[in-house]
């Protein structure tokens, strides 16, 4: 048994979509979450800068004595996950491989769409992972640079959000039967995305898919938290103002949380 928390990092609030799934499926595990909203979005930034920022988040989590780190950010996973995983002695998970595997299982037409930040799409990592496992699948990738700012400003239900999502996704409509939400911010736009793509298209939440991998690694390394002892409080940190983060988190997690500011 290991009652240390699991660390989550993201460029902002998007990783809360992963945390919500963990709280549902592994409620006895405690969490330390850090979101770099002050420097979001990561997607348009150069790879070296994303790598630098990611290491700052990792080092912050290490000061909190975490037993595992989850990259709840596709952009950070695409750029820095491999490097961090190889450098640390604790397990480090990314969200891209679980999302790719789920897309392969889902598609019946052999045509999968992937949406993500400019850096995630530019890295071509989803297409590579999917076609490594299933070379016959056609992958259509689309960068959606305006989606993260909508989520970070808590405008997901606005008419502007609907217009932007519709205009951005138009090139994929009718061309795929499965769409990977290749950014953990995007599930917060899920109702609009589903409406635009059509009810027949399966949406893959890459972040939620990684919870199964977290559970497997907890068992493998025998670092599950005790179900008998009272778990530590979940901790949430943001590099930006706490009010917007808290508003989004309370609505998404369906509970009131405390959020602290950090300058890393």
UniProtKB/Swiss-Prot annotation:
**Organism domain of life:** Bacteria
Q: What is its EC number?
A: 5.1.1.3
Which residues are responsible for catalysis? 73 (proton donor/acceptor), 183 (proton donor/acceptor)
InterPro entries registered for this protein in UniProt? Asp/Glu/hydantoin_racemase (IPR015942), Asp/Glu_race (IPR001920), Asp/Glu_racemase_AS_2 (IPR033134), Glu_race (IPR004391)
MF terms (GO), sorted A to Z:
glutamate racemase activity
What Gene Ontology terms for biological process does this UniProt record contain? cell wall organization; peptidoglycan biosynthetic process; regulation of cell shape
Does this entry carry the keyword Membrane? no
Q: Residues that bind substrate, according to the entry?
A: 10-11, 42-43, 74-75, 184-185
As its record notes, the protein acts as a catalyst of: L-glutamate = D-glutamate
What Pfam families does the database record attribute to this sequence?
Answer: Asp_Glu_race
Q: Which UniProt keywords apply?
A: Cell shape, Cell wall biogenesis/degradation, Isomerase, Peptidoglycan synthesis
User: What pathway is it annotated to?
Assistant: Cell wall biogenesis; peptidoglycan biosynthesis
What is the similarity comment for this entry? Answer: Belongs to the aspartate/glutamate racemases family.
Alphabetical list of PANTHER family matching this protein = GLUTAMATE RACEMASE
Protein purpose: Provides the (R)-glutamate required for cell wall biosynthesis.
Q: What is this protein called?
A: Glutamate racemase
Source organism: Streptococcus uberis (strain ATCC BAA-854 / 0140J)
